[in-house]
């Protein structure tokens, strides 16, 4: 697996610097946005443009914008249910597990310094599984296309046989 690249969605530059260095120790590269978008609508396009493998999203973004990190995650989930995301919070969210899936992880900020190695391993595993699932999906799509091609060729062959006869 190539170097994994994440997008850190954070409104405090000091946190960006600390977490970027922390995750670099575990072989993960974190990119960030100098200025957060005014709305959540453009985040998925940013993810595609930057070709990121995972996300780390701060829950509180009020120093730059009016929306919250969980709103960003909801918007991204409308387009992609498999990119791994870590939501950093100051407190536990009651219904987080019910709202989001296997590729979402909630972590309290107070725990990140002691658990960053664990989080990095979770990110690596999830990104590996995502890549594997995408390969299986690509094979499945190719098989469906091949099956359809064979069906069409058989149909054409049958019509040609009818014209001969």
Protein language model annotation of sequence segments:
Residues 12-16, 38, 58-65, 92-94, ...:
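Short acidic, S/G/P-rich loop/turn micro-motifs used as interaction or catalytic elements
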Residues 2-14, 19-23:
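Conserved acidic segment of CheY-like receiver
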Residues 48-50, 75-82:
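Conserved phosphotransfer cores of two-component systems
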């Amino acid at each position: 697996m190539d170097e994994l690249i994440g997008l850190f969605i954070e409104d405090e530059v000091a946190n960006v610097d600390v977490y970027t260095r922390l995750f670099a120790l575990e072989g993960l590269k974190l990119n960030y946005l100098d200025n957060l978008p005014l709305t959540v609508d453009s985040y998925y396009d940013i993810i595609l443009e930057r070709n990121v493998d995972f996300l780390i999203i701060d829950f509180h973004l009020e120093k730059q914008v009016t929306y919250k990190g969980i709103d960003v995650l909801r918007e991204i989930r409308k387009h992609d249910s498999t990119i791994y995301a870590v939501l950093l919070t100051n407190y536990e969210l009651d219904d987080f597990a019910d709202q989001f899936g296997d590729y979402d992880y909630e972590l309290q900020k107070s725990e990140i310094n002691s658990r960053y190695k664990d989080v990095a391993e979770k990110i690596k595993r999830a990104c590996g599984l995502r890549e594997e699932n995408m390969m299986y999906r690509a094979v499945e799509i190719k098989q469906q296309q091949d099956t359809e091609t064979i069906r069409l060729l058989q149909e054409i062959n049958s019509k040609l046989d009818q014209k001969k006869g």
